[in-house]
């Protein structure tokens, strides 16, 4: 692969990390800083590069694979000259003045089978039959706070246990405010990717990327929530947080959770868990992907995806948390989330 001399020059500030065999990932979320992942941990590092430098890296790296990268084509999955995989996100899919470059460094070494036990935690590999018992143990920890009526401890446990939470209520009911509160309880070392159509969420975590999709496919470089989800899965997220649920974002939400990224915190319109779930079901079913699924299949997917539905309402100057639907509570009653459709 012929390497542009300018690209080689622009990559100099990160060559030390790229050449280090301990490096697994380099995440550049904005000018001036990078997060380098080694031994499974991201460490924040200073990076003397400007916005223009990052944009040039993106354009030149895309050109290596004959991909036109820019405002009209702001997403690109490509490779660097050394074979490192690169996910590019440029404005308008990220806020103006920022660029997201996520570099995954391939391992140059192939491990033998005799190293499996030292490289992997395989303590549960033959424990399929005990998975229900483990589920019950996990449920008990959450249910203890639920049954004790300790809302603060319950919400904290939901967040740190990576339960997928759906907040429902009418406009102005406090659901977005609560989502910001819950996000602040996510452990600070986690890498967060948000997918929104407007910048509503507040993310206090250092290592985060804000991804933006266009409403109704309008605007320059218009991308869908589904496009952003596909990109985010190549960006080593600990959690993917979807903003308000609407249109094709609902399918992206479901795809995100079932792809192995639980712990999302999202909002949807609906006065109570029944209406909130029916709204989610309707949104997913109205998507191109959801329309091709049988109702039973879709309900089963949602049953594995949604752990908590929290309703909100406001009256006068009071914000109220209503009756929470909890999957663990439903399981002990012999119910599933699908039963909400029949109420």
Swiss-Prot record:
Chief site of localization: cytoplasm
Entry annotated with the keyword Cytoplasm: yes
Pfam families in alphabetical order: T2SSE
Presence of keyword Cytoplasm: yes
Entry PTM: Autophosphorylated.
Cell compartment(s), UniProt: Cytoplasm
Residues noted as binding ATP in the record, renumbered to the chain: 169-176
A GO molecular-function annotation: ATP binding
Entry's Gene Ontology BP terms: secretion by the type IV secretion system
GO cellular component, one term: type IV secretion system complex
Keyword entries, A-Z: ATP-binding, Crown gall tumor, Cytoplasm, Nucleotide-binding, Phosphoprotein, Plasmid, Transport
UniProt-listed InterPro entries: P-loop_NTPase (IPR027417), T2SS/T4SS_dom (IPR001482), T4SS_GSP_E_ATPase (IPR050921), VirB11 (IPR014155)
CDD domains to which the protein is assigned, alphabetical: VirB11-like_ATPase
Membership in a protein family: Belongs to the GSP E family.
Physiological role: Required for the transfer of T-DNA to plants. Couples energy, by means of ATP hydrolysis, to T-DNA transport.
Protein's recorded name: Protein VirB11
Protein's gene: virB11
């Amino acid at each position: 692969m012929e390497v542009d001399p300018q690209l080689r020059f622009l990559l100099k500030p990160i060559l030390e990390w790229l050449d280090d065999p301990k490096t697994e990932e380099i995440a550049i979320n904005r000018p001036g800083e990078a997060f380098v992942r080694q031994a499974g941990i991201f460490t924040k590092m200073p990076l003397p590069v400007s916005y223009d430098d990052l944009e040039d890296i993106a354009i030149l790296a895309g050109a290596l694979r004959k991909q036109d990268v820019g405002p009209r084509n702001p997403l690109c999955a490509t490779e660097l000259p050394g074979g490192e995989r690169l996910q590019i996100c440029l404005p308008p899919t990220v806020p103006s003045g920022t660029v997201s470059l996520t570099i995954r460094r391939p391992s140059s070494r192939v491990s033998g089978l005799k190293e499996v036990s030292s490289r992997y935690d395989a303590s549960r590999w033959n424990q399929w039959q005990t998975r229900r018992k483990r589920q019950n143990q996990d449920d008990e920890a959450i249910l203890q706070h639920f049954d004790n009526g300790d809302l603060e401890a319950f919400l904290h446990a939901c967040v740190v246990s990576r339960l997928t939470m759906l907040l429902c209520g009418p406009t102005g009911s406090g659901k977005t405010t609560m989502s910001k509160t819950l996000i602040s309880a996510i452990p600070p070392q986690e890498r967060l990717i948000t997918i929104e159509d407007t910048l509503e969420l507040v993310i206090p975590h250092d290592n985060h990327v804000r991804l933006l999709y266009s409403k109704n496919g309008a605007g320059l470089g218009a991308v869908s929530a589904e496009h952003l989800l596909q990109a985010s899965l190549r960006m080593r997220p600990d959690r993917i947080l979807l903003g308000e649920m609407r249109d094709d974002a609902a399918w992206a939400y479901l795809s995100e959770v079932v792809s192995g990224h639980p712990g999302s915190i999202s909002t949807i319109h609906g006065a109570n868990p029944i209406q909130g779930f029916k709204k989610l079901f309707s949104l997913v079913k109205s998507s191109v992907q959801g329309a091709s699924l049988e109702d039973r299949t879709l309900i089963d997917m949602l049953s594995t995806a949604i752990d908590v539905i929290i309703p909100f309402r406001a009256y006068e100057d009071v914000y109220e948390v209503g009756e929470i639907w909890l999957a663990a509570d439903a399981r002990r009653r012999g119910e599933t989330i699908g039963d909400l459709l029949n109420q």
